[in-house]
Structures are given as structure tokens and as C-alpha cells.
Amino acid sequence: MNVGYTALDDVHFFSSGFDEKELTGRFTTEYGGRHLDVFPINHRLRYLMPFAEPQKTIDYLKTFKGEDSVLVMADDGEKFGLWSGTHELVYTRGWLEKLFGLLEKNSSWLSTARFSDCLAAPSKGLAYLPTTSYHELSQWSLPHEKSRKLAALWEGSAEDIRPLLRGGYFRN
């Protein structure tokens, strides 16, 4: 089976030394001469959607306005209606309808696309990515006391240092 592309949490890229503003498109990784395109999943979009007002998502996306950027939001579908309280938030209170309205309103500079639509643009470069997972899972996979220590270190660290803090391996 040939897989041409995938999406991974941006923490993989941060652990390799990339900055958030660099992660605006797909990258290529390789092993033994076999190539795979990788789209970084933007953690800020994951945390904004659907828990912040839709305008905050648009405001964040505006920080990339004018650039030829691809930002990926991919996450568990259950947070859009199955998790406790999310059905009311997303549908009853209209979060999703508001977001779609704002996407239409901002369509002069903002568009949505499928991964396959973004493959025509060149790769942003080569990226060798470590085995890791998103921060919370790397924290949860540690023994309790070490998990608490990592949480305290995370909370006390500057935002630009946080991507360099790694917890345990997610298969523990």
C-alpha cells in the first residue's frame, strides 16, 4: 500500500526545532528512500475549535493573512457533539453555524481545502520527526509524581520553551 501524505500534531515538528510560524504547509519526510508528505496539525486551532468563539479562530487565522499558508485543523470528531456539553455548544448555541458564516464572510482572503488540494504546492522542506505525541498524552503516560512535576514545569515555563519539554512515551 502506498501512502502519499498524512497529518501529525505540530508537537512532532516542535520537537525537531521548528517554530509555529514555519508550519504553514506540508513537509516531506523520508526513510530509506521512501518519501511521505506530512501536514502539521495546528495545536492552536485544535484548542480554539469549538471551545472559543468562532471569531477567535478567524482572528488567529488573520495572523497568517497575506501569506501563502496552509493551516490544518484535524481533531477527534467527538469534540463536535459527543463530549459532554459539546452538542449544545456546537449545534444548539450555533457555534458551527457562526463559524461557517465567518468563513463565508472572510472568503476574500480565507479558503478551506482538502489535503489533496494542497499537494500541488511545493513541500516546505525536509523534516525528520521524532516519535512523540501531543503534550497532554506525554504527560499522562508518566507515573503520577513525574506527571505532576512535568505539569508544574510546563506551567512555569515560557511559551517558547514549552515545545522543548517532553514527557513519557505514549505506549506506556
Stretches with model-predicted labels:
Residues 46-65:
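A Trp-anchored, charged/polar loop motif used as the substrate-binding/catalytic surface
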Residues 1, 53-56, 91-95:
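Short, glycine/acidic-rich beta->alpha junctions
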Residues 2-34:
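Acidic, His- and aromatic-enriched active-site or binding-groove loops in soluble protein domains
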Residues 23-36, 40-44, 62-172:
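Active-site and substrate-binding clefts of carbohydrate-active enzymes
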Residues 15-16, 47-49, 81-83:
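Short helix/loop capping segments that flank catalytic or ligand/cofactor-binding pockets
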Residues 11-12, 43-45:
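Short acidic/polar capping segments at secondary-structure boundaries
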